[in-house]
Amino acid sequence: MASKSLVVLSACIIIGSAVPVEKLPVLKSQPAEVLFRESQPTVLECIIEGQEEGVKYTWTKDGKDFKWTEHNAAQRTNEGSLVFLSPQPSDEGHYQCFAQTAAGVASSRVISFKRTYLVAEPAKTHEKTPVEGKPFQLDCVIPNAYPKPEIFWKKSLSGADPNADSANLGRRVTAGPDGNLYFTTVEKEDVSDIYKYVCVAKSPAHDGEVRLVEYIIKEVTKDTSGYKGELVPQYLSKDIVAKVGSVTMIYCMYGGKPQGFPDYFKDGKDVNGDAGGRITRHNRTSGKRLLIKETLLEDQGTYTCEESNGVGKPVKHSLKVTVVSAPKYVKSPEKVIIAKQGQDVTIPCQVTGLPAPKVTWTHNAQPLSGGKTTVTESGLIIKGLQKGDKGYYGCRSTNEHGDEYVETLVQVN
């Protein structure tokens, strides 16, 4: 029988180890992005889990050594975590933490440290006098912000408690992804001296809501154009690139009277769906939006909405949905592998993504190349494990839509 065997050892398997797995020094996982508000204290975490003394922590920023003592920052006691006391735009960058332990040098994923902001002028109130019975829209410019804010509309009673505001605007009224509010038709019941239509933004840059613009519909005028209620386009989604796992919304918004109700097709197949389904037009928009709650690769295709209200000609709109995927692990890799000297060991790191991710490996924070290691689609194989092979093995996978990083501590008995 051969003296070597190929084994993949789970973190729960311990072969002759005197140290419990949960006490071995591994870095706590970090997020891919940390946001900060200018001048508000913010923490970049770097913590060794397990029982380990004398850990030496260092950081890089944008690939260069970062000396926190030369910046307005502090390091938490017994941790590598950085506390930016009053972060400024100049502190933005890509940070990586390194922890030197008795087992080797552990490294974090690269963390994007970005300022969150939203630039908006004080909200102004505008009075509108639309034409009765015709499609209509109220404009709301999405402000310069990071990340992109959530925009929504509500109906607000002048002088009343903001908590009494209503987000129920009625079946004829729908907010578009461009920030604007669309009326299938505007009617006399929309007129009010005391109610305002208010466009609001939510952002991690602010506590609470930020009012962007307010409108009062003072009155409606009679139509003299001869419009009969035929369907006219208001907001129609263009081609979409959607990420696996994300929410995708396809808008098919036509104005007209009576109000139509779109039917949706994917590659010619009905995808209207049922209320509560993963794909459904039943999502409180009177069918004006097809909702894909969790996008899958199979959702790629050509989508068409068709609508008729019995006045004028039926309408149709088509667009393409292209589905992409950031790197994702097929199975969560182990944080710790403990193996005997002389064994062949596989460190699992199987990744999917579209386009196919590029996978790179490090050993104790240094690029790994050739030698006794072999990279496969399922992970990294170490031939004839020796004491010098112990340490932290990092697997980083990247494509244009994201990146993932996982690190495995290999202990040799």
UniProtKB/Swiss-Prot annotation:
Keyword vocabulary terms for this entry: Blood coagulation cascade activating toxin, Disulfide bond, Glycoprotein, Hemostasis impairing toxin, Hydrolase, Immunoglobulin domain, Protease, Repeat, Secreted, Serine protease, Signal, Toxin
Disulphide linkage map: 46-97, 140-199, 252-305, 349-395
E.C. designation(s): 3.4.21.-
Protein activity control: Increased activity in presence of phospholipids (low concentrations) and calcium ions. Inhibited by PMSF.
GO function terms (MF aspect): serine-type peptidase activity; toxin activity
GO biological processes: homophilic cell adhesion via plasma membrane adhesion molecules; proteolysis
Broad class of enzyme this protein falls into: hydrolase
Signal peptide coordinates: 1-18
Subcellular location: Secreted
Cited PROSITE patterns: IG_LIKE
InterPro entries for this protein: Cell_Adh-Cytoskel_Orgn, Ig-like_dom, Ig-like_dom_sf, Ig-like_fold, Ig_I-set, Ig_sub, Ig_sub2
Sites where a glycan is attached: 283
Domain Ig-like C2-type intervals: 25-112, 122-211, 233-322, 327-413
One Pfam family from the record: Ig_3
Tissue occurrence: Expressed in larval bristles.
Any one of the GO CC terms: extracellular region
Matching CDD domains: IgI_1_hemolin-like, IgI_4_hemolin-like
Family classification: Belongs to the hemolin family.
Function: Bristle toxin involved in caterpillar defense by participating in hemorrhagic syndrome characterized by a consumptive coagulopathy. Exhibits procoagulant activity through selective factor X proteolytic activation. Activates factor X in a dose- and time-dependent manner but does not activate gamma-carboxyglutamic acid domainless factor X. Its activity does not depend on calcium ions. Also functions as a growth stimulator and an inhibitor of cellular death for endothelial cells.
Further details from the record: The recombinant protein is recognized by an antilonomic horse hyperimmune serum.
Name the record gives this protein: Hemolin
